[in-house]
Structures are given as C-alpha cells and as structure tokens.
A protein has these predicted regions:
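A short, Lys/Arg-rich alpha-helix, primarily the initiator
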Residues: 1-16, 62
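Short alpha-helical "recognition helix" segments of helix-turn-helix
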Residues: 24-25
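Recognition helix of helix-turn-helix/homeodomain-like DNA-binding domains
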Residues: 31-44
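Helix-turn-helix DNA-binding elements, focusing on the entry/boundary residues of the two helices
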Residues: 10, 21, 32
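DNA major-groove recognition helix of helix-turn-helix/homeodomain DNA-binding modules
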Residues: 48-65
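N-terminal flexible/basic segments that precede or flank functional cores
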Residues: 1-2, 43, 52-55
Length: 65
C-alpha cells in the first residue's frame, strides 16, 4: 500500500515536535495501534487527514502555552 503524502508530512511534524503515536492516540480517543495503521497507510478512514492534523496542531498549541 502506498502511504498518502499527508501521512509522511504529519509523521515528520510529529517527529520534529516530539509527539508520539501514543500522545496522538490519546488526543484522538483511539489506540496507538490504530494511529500507526492510519499513518502507515493500512487504514484510510474518511476524514482522517483533517482529524489527525487538528489533533497534532492542538498538541503543539498545548505545549506552547
């Protein structure tokens, strides 16, 4: 399966901001395994890009305040 470009960009941003799959999963209310499946392109749920980006943005904002 080919990973979407957005997942690569998001993984890079998460790495730069030191955000883990576990932290993202907690923010989204899902398991870290599910986060991994989506980011690795094994799952492509509707609206995932928007939900995942919003959660990462929120985690970044929370750290800066």
């Amino acid at each position: 399966m080919l990973s979407k470009e957005w997942t690569g960009n998001l993984v890079g941003l998460m790495h730069n901001e030191k955000i883990t799959n576990i932290q993202l999963a907690e923010k989204l209310g899902v398991t870290d395994r599910y986060v991994s499946m989506v980011l690795n392109g094994h799952r492509e749920p509707d609206g995932a890009e928007q939900r995942f980006r919003a959660a990462v943005d929120e985690l970044i904002r929370e750290r800066k305040t």
